[in-house]
């Protein structure tokens, strides 16, 4: 972003924010706080998400009475390509496990690409995750607190270049912590909308 910073500063539709709290979770929290619109889309910058799905998200959340539109790469009508095999197997196992624990049929909690009403994201705060596990925390809080959401099939295309910062060995404990935290919040604290 440093190289593109001057370019984006000149554009009316872009704001460059200096994030004091490092990490992906800090960046997402800052983006939510500073978002100017009613809706917030979270997506990765690696071009793996389909922009046609973004248009569909926006239409659905604006026309329906939804707090969130949750995409799934693993529904009839979804297209997935170039997903690393080991990562895919772990993804499917973990998401199935989460579905069992939370007694919910949603099957793609860990996918980043979703759209939310900004006020809903503010209401479920604080978001405590500091890394990729924030993508698990947000939909778990949405679902556990009984917000209104819709699940739709989306497309995903593997990264064409560069390397992912997602490291399974490093993030496993963070995902487990988030899962336990959200489970306790749902079952012991009984926090609702």
Task: Put a short name on every predicted segment.
Residues 63, 177-193:
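Terminal low-complexity segments of carbohydrate-biosynthetic enzymes
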Residues 1-17:
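Acidic donor-binding segment of Leloir-type glycosyltransferases
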Residues 4-5, 57, 138:
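Aromatic/hydrophobic pocket-lining residues that form π-stacking "cages" and hydrophobic walls in ligand
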Residues 19-22, 26-34, 39-42, 51-132, ...:
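Acceptor/aglycone-binding surface of glycosyltransferases and processive sugar-polymer synthases
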Residues 9-12, 63, 144:
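Short, well-ordered coil/turn elements that cap or connect secondary structure elements
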Residues 104-105, 127-130, 139-157:
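Catalytic donor-sugar/metal-binding loop of nucleotide-sugar-dependent glycosyltransferases
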Residues 47-49:
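Acidic metal-phosphate-binding loop of nucleotide-sugar-dependent transferases
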């Amino acid at each position: 972003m440093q190289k593109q910073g001057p370019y984006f500063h000149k554009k009316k539709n872009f704001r460059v924010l200096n994030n004091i709290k490092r990490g992906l979770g800090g960046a997402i929290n800052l983006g939510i706080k500073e978002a100017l619109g009613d809706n917030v889309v979270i997506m990765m910058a690696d071009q793996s998400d389909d922009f046609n799905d973004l248009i569909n998200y926006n239409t659905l959340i604006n026309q329906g009475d939804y707090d969130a539109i949750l995409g799934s790469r693993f529904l009839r009508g979804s297209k997935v390509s170039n997903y690393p095999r080991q990562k895919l197997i772990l993804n499917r196992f973990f998401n199935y496990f989460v579905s069992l624990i939370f007694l919910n049929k949603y099957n793609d909690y860990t996918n980043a690409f979703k759209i939310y009403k900004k006020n809903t994201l503010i209401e479920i705060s604080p978001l405590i995750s500091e890394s990729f596990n924030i993508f698990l925390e947000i939909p778990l809080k949405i679902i556990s607190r009984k917000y209104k959401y819709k699940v739709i099939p989306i497309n995903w295309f593997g990264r064409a270049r560069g390397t992912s910062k997602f490291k399974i060995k490093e993030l496993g404990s963070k995902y487990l912590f988030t899962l336990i935290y959200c489970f306790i919040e749902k079952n012991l604290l009984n926090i609702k909308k």
